[in-house]
């Protein structure tokens, strides 16, 4: 499965415990697809919300590309519909209703058929001490790798 990752949401991995990952298609306009191919995407603070039985990607910033139609300037942070099966949406709706659970966007990529996809995750927020533990663990892992590299 060759997938070309365009953008990652590193902040989501730091702020949340990831419980389950899903792949969802994204309903985009042509100029947005061109902008994604050019790498003009920012997923910081983006999340998924289920509204009236449909999943939407909110706060994802897809920049306007200057080479597209100059008379049409789309909203760069508009809600984008995510394409999921009904059973998946129902399952996510039930899971998100639990306190502390949320849906976050982890990455946007093109799959082997050149379709734009979003990797979303069911996540639970971390506390401050969890974030500190994550940082300590990363530092220890780095030190261990450096020590192994020396020998």
From Swiss-Prot:
What biological-process GO terms show up in the record?
trans-translation
Give the main location.
cytoplasm
Q: Which residues form the signal peptide?
A: none
Recorded GO MF terms: RNA binding
| Keywords annotated in UniProt | Cytoplasm, RNA-binding
Where would you find this protein in the cell? Cytoplasm
Q: Of which family is this protein a member? A: Belongs to the SmpB family.
Cited NCBIfam families: PRK05422.1, smpB
* Protein known as: SsrA-binding protein
Native organism is Wolinella succinogenes (strain ATCC 29543 / DSM 1740 / CCUG 13145 / JCM 31913 / LMG 7466 / NCTC 11488 / FDC 602W) (Vibrio succinogenes)
């Amino acid at each position: 499965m060759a997938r070309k990752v365009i953008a990652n949401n590193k902040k989501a991995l730091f702020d949340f415990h990831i419980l389950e990952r899903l792949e969802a298609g994204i309903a985009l306009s042509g100029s947005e697809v061109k902008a994604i191919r050019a790498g003009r995407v920012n997923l910081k603070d983006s999340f998924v919300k289920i509204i009236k039985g449909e999943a939407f990607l909110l706060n994802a910033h897809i920049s306007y590309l200057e080479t597209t139609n100059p008379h049409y300037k789309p909203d760069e942070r508009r809600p984008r519909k995510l394409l999921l099966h009904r059973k998946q949406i129902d399952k996510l709706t039930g899971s998100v209703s639990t306190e502390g659970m949320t849906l976050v966007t982890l990455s946007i990529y093109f799959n082997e058929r050149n379709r734009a996809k979003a990797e979303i995750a069911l996540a639970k927020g971390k506390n401050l001490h969890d974030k500190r533990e994550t940082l300590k663990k990363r530092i220890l892992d780095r030190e261990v790798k450096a020590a192994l590299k020396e020998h």
